Design a protein with these regions (language model features):
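GIY-YIG nuclease catalytic motif and its immediate N-terminal context
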Residues: 1-40, 47-71
Length: 73
């Protein structure tokens, strides 16, 4: 890991309509709050609140690697 690189988490949440949403974040707690309340939540989850559970699937050094894993999921 190089100096300055962040750890990114790949996560999945279950929405109120029982669908799944995957994403990446550097701060899982903040991201769950954003999905439930904030304007920064994904458009997909804004219409499917509340989001109760978040499962962290893996972690990566660098956003690009995390997004590649998200795409494969």
């Amino acid at each position: 890991m190089q100096v300055g690189e962040k750890v990114w988490f790949l996560y999945v949440v279950r929405c109120s309509d029982n669908t799944l949403y995957t994403g990446v974040t550097t701060n899982p707690d903040r991201r769950l709050r954003e999905h439930n309340k904030g304007r920064r939540g994904a458009k997909y989850t804004q219409a499917r609140r509340p989001i109760d559970d978040m499962v962290l699937l893996d972690w990566f050094v660098g956003r690009s690697r995390a997004q590649k894993a998200e795409y494969k999921f």
